[in-house]
Amino acid sequence: MAELACFVSFSLTEDKVKWFPINKKAVKTMLCAKVEKDQRSNYYDTILYGVAPPPEFRNRFKTTERYGLDYESDQYSEVANLLADVLNMVSMPTEKFQFDIVKTVVQVRHLENLLLRIKDTDDILSENVKLRVKAVMIACNLVNETETTPLTESNEIVYQDSYFTITKLDYSSHKLLPLMADEYKITINTKTDIPDRDQTAFAAYIRYNFNKFAAISHGKRHWRLVLHSQLMSHAERLDRKIKSDKKHGRQFAYDDGDMAFVHPGWKACIGQLCGGTTFEVAKTSLYSVKTSKTVRTATNKIESDLISMVGN
């Protein structure tokens, strides 16, 4: 994770907020600077290279002893430039600006994936500036907007129908925060009601073709397919998010769209966590709740249909 302030700084003019990308030399200077404790929440002036992120976020950056953002990579500068460009397009009035916005946690891997989409000249995100702004704002958690298929982070499509798209998420070649994990993302193509029969058919497709994976939600109406062995760690992460929001007086909002394909154990566990149940109790639901009979029947039909085709 990393805060917005790890990539951009700002200045206040008479009528609007002006955003600037932070450069890698400024970050490097900040990491070796001695800063008084009461000044660590402020942006650091490097004198030579402009403003650097607040030193309180120094642990977000990679060093020889620590895993973190590779600020010396080209992708760091590209993400910083992208964020500054998009935030300047949004044109935030000075009187509405609050400093806490720079402490907003952004989705770093999501942003690096968006860079790849923008560079792909065949992708609509390459030319559609309005769509690009919205996609970046979603990745920065700065808008309450559903991440539909046109706005999603990856364009490596592995499945698509009238309502849903599954894209593969490959973070292994990332430079900022590489991650070796097999994951997929599910997004809706449009904001229309999806008939139960189509949800069931999609749930059966996932269960049959992605049987090593479970469909989970972090509550923002898009979904991930993660390995069953990773369910517990994802649930722990969401539990920490719920506790953090409660501690800081924020309302945690969870909306999985009540989709038929969401893993039943995940749905039960997160429902309990949102209701105040301890993680130790709620986690027992992760692997104990069975898939609905309707979805199991639809999955069996896929298998029987395939066997019939082979027989013919």
From Swiss-Prot:
Say if the entry is tagged with keyword ATP-binding. yes
Region (RNA-binding) residue ranges read 202-238
Tell me the compartments it is located in: Host cytoplasm
Matching entries from SUPFAM superfamilies are given as: Rotavirus NSP2 fragment, C-terminal domain, Rotavirus NSP2 fragment, N-terminal domain
The EC code for this enzyme is: 3.6.4.-
Q: Which Pfam families match?
A: Rota_NS35_C, Rota_NS35_N
Instruction: Give an example GO biological process.
Output: viral genome replication
Which residues, by range, are in coiled-coil regions?
A: none
Q: How does it assemble?
A: Homooctamer. Interacts with VP1; this interaction is weak. Interacts with NSP5; this interaction leads to up-regulation of NSP5 phosphorylation and formation of viral factories.
Name of the protein in its database record: Non-structural protein 2
Source organism of this protein record: Rotavirus C (strain RVC/Pig/United States/Cowden/1980) (RV-C)
Q: What lineage does the source organism belong to?
A: Viruses, Riboviria, Orthornavirae, Duplornaviricota, Resentoviricetes
